[in-house]
Amino acid sequence: MEPEREGTERHPRKVRESRQAPNKLVGAAEAMKAGWDLEESQPEAKKARLSTILFTDNCEVTHDQLCELLKYAVLGKSNVPKPSWCQLFHQNHLNNVVVFVLQGMSQLHFYRFYLEFGCLRKAFRHKFRLPPPSSDFLADVVGLQTEQRAGDLPKTMEGPLPSNAKAAINLQDDPIIQKYGSKKVGLTRCLLTKEEMRTFHFPLQGFPDCENFLLTKCNGSIADNSPLFGLDCEMCLTSKGRELTRISLVAEGGCCVMDELVKPENKILDYLTSFSGITKKILNPVTTKLKDVQRQLKALLPPDAVLVGHSLDLDLRALKMIHPYVIDTSLLYVREQGRRFKLKFLAKVILGKDIQCPDRLGHDATEDARTILELARYFLKHGPKKIAELNLEALANHQEIQAAGQEPKNTAEVLQHPNTSVLECLDSVGQKLLFLTRETDAGELPSSRNCQTIKCLSNKEVLEQARVEIPLFPFSIVQFSFKAFSPVLTEEMNKRMRIKWTEISTVYAGPFSKNCNLRALKRLFKSFGPVQSMTFVLETRQPHLCIQYEVLEAAQLAIESLDGILVDGICIKVQRPVTELTLDCDTLVNELEGDSENQGSIYLSGVSETFKEQLLQEPRLFLGLEAVILPKDLKSGKQKKYCFLKFKSFGSAQQALNILTGKDWKLKGRHALTPRHLHAWLRGLPPESTRLPGLRVVPPPFEQEALQTLKLDHPKIAAWRWSRKIGKLYNSLCPGTLCLILLPGTKSTHGSLSGLGLMGIKEEEESAGPGLCS
């Protein structure tokens, strides 16, 4: 089973080497591993720095992964695992860590007011998407467990759970009772609704990231006597992310009907043996592929089958399959504040079973699948009231406190606790954390001997205190608070964002002769990149073409290459539609091209399926090449005819662009405009009908009214003011400071907004020099 979700003086650290992290670029070729190793061995590289590329699934970094990086920044590789999603070279040369949290802001804020966020986006080369926050974002990021969130950090607690634990509980306050009531429920009541499946990221038909997923074809009617099947999968880490290595399916009664090892399609970087139990020796002789187990699973499941799993969304995504009827025991046994009980814990306290024992090599997928099924049957048999009376929350808290037990005395002891928080890591090396926030903010860190909390009356006071206090602490968290978008304004801004990016990726071309060669024209415009649609406009005296491209780079390349040329003796104009959403598109394009994340990236159109191999055969021509990003068609899986190349520097990228668009390669290209995480976000927005390009839009009333009264606290003004203020504060930090800017996103009953993270090391890049926001 996969891992489940859930004093100011500085001490010198030992010199540590950096290790190669796996490349998880979606649709990318393997990065130049040898190049990294060579670079890492150079003696002159004595400054802490980050890898140029991030290894993230769907360009998203989870809160747990952020915590990985922060703990590694404190302790280094000798004491905690390296972060799985980025490389931090020369960690021992870091001087400070500073995290700025902009509560109330999201990725929508950043791209809706992209021009206003100029200081921050220019300073930080690394940007990544964050999932919507839980009710306690800060605690998630620093890795605090439940009992550490509300008050003082525990010191020690021994002995059994107090005898009055059950008597003290108010059953009506138990989240299980609040969701299911106190009476027994049938199987259908335990199924996740479609809305819940969407919320918890289950693969669903019609969603952009699931277009190549297979349906199980289980579409029969569901009743309380429908058959249950326990499912558990194990994964490994490949060059394309996590891939399936084992699947176990258990039918009611405990009979294992399927237990298969699976050979991943891509190169394996990490077998994740401690979780999966899979080793190279075990997997070497295996010939079964993902398509084989997909076929087998479809044949095994009856039309009314209900799949039961623990964090089942991860298993279905590994299988690349969509199933409509699911029970997830990590959600069935509801826990407070959106947290989840571990399978090992539920097995022990509900069933009296010991699973996932530390003396075994990895997890037993069949045992886990059988346990999951038993937990579902127990819930159905005994009902929510029986579960609530067990007081699982108190038992879990007591167990976690006992696990935390002895306060770490040194870093070796920290290693024994995988759930160690950033605070405990700092304490183990005798360091202290500064937490600056407003008095009215909900998110807090617990009081402890190594956490100095300073509460202020306003964002302005937080900023003033930060200037004074940050240099005194090795690790600082500075939290600002802003008013989140209302649900109505959020919906309007989402719609306008979708329309805006459609329109700036659309061009009108003409006039053309009435006898023009339409086939040749289509071929010409398609040569600049993937075309979403192409239509003739006949409203004008002479014909025009309207071309909507998939990517902004293709539209810009068409304008730059064709505007003003002669076609059949007629001078044509190639331009974007002019609406209030595209009036500043020239400024926006210039700013996107100058974005620090796009420095060193180029876009190419007309690449063949063998392009990557040809490219890698000419290493001397393309010095500094770090990644080849080859997008694939979601339906067919075929490589598209465009790509992005990422280089170490702008100069290397420019040299490569000159070569690749020259007479020998004959490709079309330009510098990149849109970073990967932006592509992923726009692709993931819910489908929405858009107006025809060129038609006038009446601004939605809420945003129109807000924009006409640009008050000091308006998001547009706030983005500009605080981007400059935080940018100036960043410029004042000492060299070698790891800095993260986190826009956590928002979560409410009306919907969720993804967050955004920006990351850099002070003076890591030239663009982060002084005067950036002066």
UniProtKB/Swiss-Prot annotation:
Composition-biased stretches (Basic and acidic residues): 1-19
EC number: 3.1.-.-
Stretches the record annotates as Disordered: 1-22
One Gene Ontology MF term: RNA binding
Cysteine pairings via disulfide bonds: none
Record keywords: Exonuclease, Hydrolase, Nuclease, Repeat, RNA-binding
Annotated ranges, domain RRM: 505-579, 600-679
Keyword presence, RNA-binding: yes
Signal peptide feature range: none
Residues of the Exonuclease domain: 228-376
A single BP term in Gene Ontology: rRNA 3'-end processing
Pfam families the record matches: RNase_T, RRM_1
EC class of the enzyme, as a word: hydrolase
GO cellular component, one term: nucleus
PANTHER family: RNA EXONUCLEASE 5, RNA EXONUCLEASE REXO1 / RECO3 FAMILY MEMBER-RELATED
Protein name: RNA exonuclease 5
